[in-house]
């Protein structure tokens, strides 16, 4: 009986760990929305800001990848 409860709680914990993907998706959407807003206001400055755009996107996506890694660790290691 206890093995089933711990397995169930493991799945709940892994599901809760993947909620970090929501923050990652919101962050990437916010980054691109801000970039497009700024590019429409000043099109000549957009090419210089493209590098910053991709750095911000990579950092925001890293949080989502970390949350998936935590979920995998909870499922298979814990």
UniProtKB/Swiss-Prot annotation:
Name of the protein: ATP synthase subunit c
Family: Belongs to the ATPase C chain family.
Coiled coil: none
Gene symbol of the encoding locus: atpE
Site location (Reversibly protonated during proton transport): 61
Gene Ontology terms for molecular function: lipid binding; proton-transporting ATP synthase activity, rotational mechanism
Subcellular location: Cell inner membrane
Task performed by this protein: F(1)F(0) ATP synthase produces ATP from ADP in the presence of a proton or sodium gradient. F-type ATPases consist of two structural domains, F(1) containing the extramembraneous catalytic core and F(0) containing the membrane proton channel, linked together by a central stalk and a peripheral stalk. During catalysis, ATP synthesis in the catalytic domain of F(1) is coupled via a rotary mechanism of the central stalk subunits to proton translocation. Key component of the F(0) channel; it plays a direct role in translocation across the membrane. A homomeric c-ring of between 10-14 subunits forms the central stalk rotor element with the F(1) delta and epsilon subunits.
Keywords of the record: ATP synthesis, Cell inner membrane, Cell membrane, CF(0), Hydrogen ion transport, Ion transport, Lipid-binding, Membrane, Transmembrane, Transmembrane helix, Transport
Presence of keyword Transmembrane: yes
Xref: InterPro entries: ATP_synth_F0_csu, ATP_synth_F0_csu_sf, ATPase_proteolipid_c-like_dom, F/V-ATP_Csub_sf
Subunit structure: F-type ATPases have 2 components, F(1) - the catalytic core - and F(0) - the membrane proton channel. F(1) has five subunits: alpha(3), beta(3), gamma(1), delta(1), epsilon(1). F(0) has three main subunits: a(1), b(2) and c(10-14). The alpha and beta chains form an alternating ring which encloses part of the gamma chain. F(1) is attached to F(0) by a central stalk formed by the gamma and epsilon chains, while a peripheral stalk is formed by the delta and b chains.
Membrane-crossing segments per the record: 16-36, 57-77
Pfam name, any one: ATP-synt_C
Signal sequence residues: none
Gene Ontology CC: plasma membrane; proton-transporting ATP synthase complex; proton-transporting two-sector ATPase complex, proton-transporting domain
Main location: membrane
NCBIfam families to which the protein is assigned, alphabetical: PRK07558.1
Keyword Cell membrane in annotation: yes
Source organism (scientific name): Hyphomonas neptunium (strain ATCC 15444)
UniProt membrane topology term: Multi-pass membrane protein
């Amino acid at each position: 009986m206890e093995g089933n409860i711990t397995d169930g709680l493991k799945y709940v914990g892994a599901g809760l760990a993947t909620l970090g993907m929501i923050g990652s998706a919101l962050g990437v959407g916010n980054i691109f929305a801000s970039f497009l807003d700024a590019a429409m206001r000043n099109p000549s400055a957009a090419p210089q800001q493209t590098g910053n755009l991709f750095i911000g996107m990579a950092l925001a996506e890293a949080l989502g990848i970390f949350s998936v890694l935590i979920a995998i660790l909870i499922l298979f290691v814990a």
